[in-house]
């Protein structure tokens, strides 16, 4: 929002510099930038004075004008009819950038010879300066214009550019900014109540107004001016519109735009003679209706749009844009002015649907008080009578079907201190309310003292000005008190208590960590509903129906119970993806399951469930792609838990829905935390899955009690390593984990890797052979063969003693 400083000072005289003014408003919550409207716009353009005007020797319609521009005199050839010696003009030297008066494009002024006489510059019209479309003659400046001053400085205007927040629609006008600044500097602005002199007949005999939707239009006011003369606006009015970023059109339209910028209330002017029925109806659009708006575009309307109509035609799109059929033109003799209050939501929807954002709709969208409509209407009528003449009909048409009271807010003065952290009466809320233009009175509501509002004298009822539609509660009022008093005046108080140390729950961090790891492994995350069906759970667990929590009002039979496992959604998703021929799938889900407990309570552990199926790698012509197997899933589990600083063990399990012999329980110490295995053929068939699927499900709520994601620094070993192979014969009941745990206890052993297992004729029937790669390395010196041999002998003795293993010959 752009506000000319000179205009603002007409309502609030102040000696503050533009920078100080901008700083005060910015600190109060409205960011302000100071601009010069024409700074650097006209290089080489100066205020000049015509010294002589002589006839052109070779052309009757041209004259020779000698111009003094402060640093010398130049002769200019021009055809302007209004050149007169002594006039102050705008003189452009060679190199100036102006607007071509014929095509409206920018041009660089060059030396020219016109009918045999050299012209060294130009005396400029308003159009050539980009001020308006006027091109009939040159721009004549006031007699006190200083010769030699840059035109950008003389014609320029200090502009305050406001960055408005959505709730401050009251600052979209000069008077609103004057009120805001006045409150900040404790000076009431001079804003008088406008009125006009009526000399015509009663307006009620001239027009009838009917509102058919009182929710979308709460007030409609109108005035009538007859016998006006449409023409150009005065220079001062045009300049202010241009400074605010608006284009002058004619005196009537310019007056309505001027008042909108002045008071914030959009107005619209109709050609009264084009309203044949003299009956205006405010109603919603009907399906299929169309309107050609002022921009010449035919627009299709919908029933949620509000219209201004006659009984037989549409004449305007309420709050957005007028219709072409009642446009004010040069032939207009009588004008009907509209100033109304429309529903902000309706205007926003209409402007958005038609992609027709206008200055009017921007203001209506923020919400306007019903009290503002007649104020702006009187001011616009007054201004048009001044600049366009005519006679105003007596009175105003004012239709307001539902009478409204002004909003009020009850505020406990002690609450101001509590919210702002003050001690004692730091701020005088009533005095600040007066600076804002608000009224107030004592308030007493019996029985409210117990809620902490203080004594009876502590309560006040505040009545915000009609222009402040954003003040709706006591918190809004407290914000105003702090804003106007100054946030920087609120004292900084040390905390009277130490800030308690709050332990961060480990689970969210663990889940983020696991997501990163699984994404790195190529997994995709699934997020499913927490609801499922008994039938789905029965399919997952091979007919065994686990106890589950039933939903009292399920949306469907497929969402009748809370899930007791994450597997159903993963299996269903896998089957759906395989139908679309997706191969090499890796899916996981992190989420809660819901297990019933005694006394109508439930356990809600966080779980991680994942599955792999299909090819383990992408197809490659040089080798066949292998599918996932049980040990791929086991390796992923081991990697995941090891990244959390945990060592996982595996034990024989008998989990329903998994293949016997191809499943294992996951243990941390002696605590079961999950299950791992291959989907049983029966379960896979129930989901339409035809390939091997391997899954694991881990109870994270249990796992995190042993987890740590702290990273430890490990120095890179500078000494060489030694590799040895070890082949053992041992009972089939001995597991690989038992062997590797014993070997890993020796300090010099850095890695143990099983590379072969044999069961057959070369060993006894109840025996098996396991072969290992062992990596030896010292942190302090280079190992010798004797060092490694000694450790190998110790390993064999331990294995023989604890497992009965012997060296395979």
Swiss-Prot record:
Cofactor notes: Binds 2 magnesium ions per tetramer.
Gene Ontology molecular function: ATP binding; magnesium ion binding; phenylalanine-tRNA ligase activity; tRNA binding
A GO CC annotation given for this chain: phenylalanine-tRNA ligase complex
Lineage of source species: Bacteria, Bacillati, Chloroflexota, Dehalococcoidia, Dehalococcoidales
Domain B5: 404-492
The tRNA-binding domain, residue ranges: 39-152
Cofactor(s) listed: Mg(2+)
Gene3D superfamilies: 3.30.56.10, Bira Bifunctional Protein, Domain 2, Ferrodoxin-fold anticodon-binding domain, Nucleic acid-binding proteins, Phenylalanyl-trna Synthetase, Chain B, domain 3
Reactions this protein catalyses: tRNA(Phe) + L-phenylalanine + ATP = L-phenylalanyl-tRNA(Phe) + AMP + diphosphate + H(+)
HAMAP family: Phe_tRNA_synth_beta1
NCBIfam families, alphabetized: pheT_bact
One GO-annotated biological process of the protein: phenylalanyl-tRNA aminoacylation
Description of how the protein assembles with itself and partners: Tetramer of two alpha and two beta subunits.
SUPFAM superfamilies xref list: Anticodon-binding domain of PheRS (SSF54991), Class II aaRS and biotin synthetases (SSF55681), Nucleic acid-binding proteins (SSF50249), PheT/TilS domain (SSF56037), Putative DNA-binding domain (SSF46955)
Protein name: Phenylalanine--tRNA ligase beta subunit
Protein family membership: Belongs to the phenylalanyl-tRNA synthetase beta subunit family. Type 1 subfamily.
């Amino acid at each position: 929002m752009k506000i000319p400083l000179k205009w603002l000072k007409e309502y609030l005289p102040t000696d503050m510099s533009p920078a100080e003014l901008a700083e005060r408003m910015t600190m109060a919550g409205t960011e302000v930038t100071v601009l010069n409207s024409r700074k650097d716009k006209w290089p080489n353009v100066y205020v000049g004075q015509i010294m002589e005007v002589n006839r052109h020797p070779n052309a009757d319609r041209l004259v020779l004008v000698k111009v003094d521009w402060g640093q010398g005199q130049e002769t200019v050839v021009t055809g302007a009819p209004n050149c007169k010696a002594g006039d102050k003009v705008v003189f452009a030297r060679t190199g100036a950038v102006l607007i071509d008066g014929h095509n409206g494009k920018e041009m660089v002024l060059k030396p020219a010879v016109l009918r045999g006489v050299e012209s060294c510059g130009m005396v400029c019209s308003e159009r050539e300066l980009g001020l308006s479309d006027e091109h009939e003659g040159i721009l004549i400046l006031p007699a006190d214009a200083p010769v030699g001053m840059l035109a950008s400085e003389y014609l320029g205007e200090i502009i305050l550019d406001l960055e408005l927040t959505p709730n401050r629609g009251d600052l979209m006008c000069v008077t609103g900014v004057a009120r805001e600044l006045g409150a900040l500097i404790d000076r009431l602005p001079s804003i008088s109540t406008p009125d006009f002199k009526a000399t015509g007949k009663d307006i009620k005999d001239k027009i009838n107004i009917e509102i058919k939707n009182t929710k979308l239009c709460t007030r409609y006011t109108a005035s009538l001016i007859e016998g006006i003369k449409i023409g150009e606006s005065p220079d001062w009015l045009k300049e202010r519109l241009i400074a605010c970023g608006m284009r002058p059109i004619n005196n009537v339209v310019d007056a309505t735009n001027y008042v909108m910028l002045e008071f914030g209330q959009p107005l619209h002017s109709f050609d009264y003679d084009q309203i044949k029925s003299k009956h205006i109806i405010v109603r919603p659009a009907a399906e299929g209706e169309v309107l050609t708006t002022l921009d010449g575009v035919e627009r299709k309307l919908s029933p949620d749009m509000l219209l201004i109509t006659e009984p037989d035609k549409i004449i305007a799109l309420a709050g957005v844009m007028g219709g072409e059929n009642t446009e004010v033109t040069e032939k207009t003799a009588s004008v009907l002015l509209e100033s109304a209050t429309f529903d902000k939501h309706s205007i926003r929807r209409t402007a958005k649907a038609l992609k027709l954002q206008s200055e009017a709709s921007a203001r209506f969208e923020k919400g306007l008080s019903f009290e503002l409509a007649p104020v702006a209407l009187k001011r616009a009528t007054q201004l048009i009578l001044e600049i366009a003449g005519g006679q105003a009909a007596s009175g105003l048409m004012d239709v307001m079907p539902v009478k409204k009271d002004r909003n009020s807010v009850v505020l406990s003065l002690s609450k101001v201190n509590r919210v702002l952290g003050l001690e004692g009466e730091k701020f005088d809320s009533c005095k600040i309310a007066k600076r804002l233009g608000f009224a107030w009175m004592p308030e007493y509501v019996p029985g409210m003292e117990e809620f902490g509002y203080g004594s009876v004298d502590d309560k006040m009822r505040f009545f915000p000005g009609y222009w402040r539609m954003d003040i709706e509660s006591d918190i809004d009022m407290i914000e105003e008190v702090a804003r106007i008093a100054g946030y920087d005046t609120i004292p900084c108080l040390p905390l009277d208590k130490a800030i308690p140390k709050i332990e961060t729950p480990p689970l969210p961090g663990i889940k983020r960590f696991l997501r990163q790891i699984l994404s790195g492994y190529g997994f995709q995350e699934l997020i499913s509903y927490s609801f499922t069906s008994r039938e789905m759970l029965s399919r997952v667990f091979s007919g065994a129906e686990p106890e589950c929590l039933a939903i009292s009002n399920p949306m469907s039979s497929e969402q009748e119970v809370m899930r007791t496992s994450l597997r159903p959604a993963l299996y269903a998703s896998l089957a759906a993806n395989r139908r679309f021929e997706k191969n090499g799938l890796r899916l996981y889900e992190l989420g809660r399951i819901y297990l019933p407990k005694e006394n109508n309570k439930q356990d809600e552990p966080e779980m991680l469930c994942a599955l792999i199926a299909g090819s383990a790698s992408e197809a490659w012509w040089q080798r066949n792609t292998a599918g996932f197997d049980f040990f791929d899933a086991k390796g992923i589990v081991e990697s995941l838990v090891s990244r959390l600083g945990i060592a996982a063990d595996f034990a024989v399990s008998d989990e329903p829905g998994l293949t016997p012999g191809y499943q294992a329980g996951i243990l941390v110490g002696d605590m079961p935390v999950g299950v791992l295995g291959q989907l049983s053929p029966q379960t896979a068939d129930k989901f339409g899955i035809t390939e091997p699927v391997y899954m694991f499900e881990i109870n994270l709520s249990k796992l995190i009690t042993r987890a740590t994601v702290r990273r430890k620094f490990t120095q890179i070993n500078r000494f060489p390593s030694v590799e040895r192979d070890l082949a053992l014969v041992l009972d089939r009941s001995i597991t690989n984990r038992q062997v590797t745990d014993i070997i890993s206890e020796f300090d010099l052993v850095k890695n143990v890797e099983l590379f072969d297992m044999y069961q057959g004729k070369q060993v006894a029937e109840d025996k098996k052979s396991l072969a290992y790669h062992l990596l030896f390395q010292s942190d302090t010196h280079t190992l010798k063969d004797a060092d490694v041999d000694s450790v190998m002998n110790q390993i064999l003795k331990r294995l023989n003693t604890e497992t009965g293993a012997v060296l395979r010959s």
